[in-house]
C-alpha cells in the first residue's frame, strides 16, 4: 500500500512538470481558437453573453467574481495541485482560490492592461494574449468548457472526482488531450489558470493567497524584497536567518 503522504508529494509535481509542458505545447487547432479569438463575431458574442449571465451579480459566498459552480471548480483545482500535507494546508485553506477570484474581479480580469481593440487573429506563442475576451470572461468560458468536458469523459463534475482522477484530468488539459470546440482549453489552463495558481502561492498575502506566508516559509523566502535588499549578497545561496518569520506588506503598514 502506498503512503498517502508520498502521493501528496507526487501531486506537487505540477509545480515542475506543468512549467515545461506549457512552454512546449503547440498552438490549439484553428477551429478551437477561432470560436474565442474572434473569427466568428456571433460565437464570441454568444459566449460572452452566456458567461456574463452566469456570473454577473451572483458571486459565490466569500468571493467577488466566482459563481457557485466556478468556486467549486477552482477550489477543487487548487486543492488538487496543492493538497493538504506536512508542507502546507490545502490550496483553499492557503487562500489560493481567493487570490484567483480577486485577480479576475479586478483590473487584470477586466483587461485593464491588455489591448482589446482587435483585430482578432490566431497568434503565435511569442505574441502573448490574442483573444477577444477579457481574462475574466475567458476564464468563465473555459471553466464551463472544462467542466463539460470532464462530465463527458468521466460522467462526473471535476470536484466529484477522486484526487487521482482530478490530477490526471488536469494533466490531460495541460497536454492538450482534453479539447473543446468553443474554447482552447490547453491555452486556458496553461496561460491563465495555472499562472494564477503560481502567483497565488507566492504573492504577498495582502492579495489573498499565500495565507500566513505559508509558501514563503516553505521555501525559506524572507519576504518583502525592499526589506532584504542589503542581505542578498551576504546570504546568497545560504539559508536566511529570518526566513522563518518573513515580512509582508501588512507588517509595515
Where are these regions (language model features)?
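Signal peptide processing junction and immediate N-terminal pro/mature segment
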Residues: 30-50
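Short, contiguous pre-domain boundary segments
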Residues: 52-60
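Short, charge-rich amphipathic segments
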Residues: 15, 48, 74-76, 80
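Start-of-domain signal
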Residues: 63-65
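Functionally constrained cores in energy, signaling, and assembly domains
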Residues: 20, 26-28, 82, 103, ...
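Mature-region segments of soluble proteins
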Residues: 2-5, 58-59, 69-76, 87-253
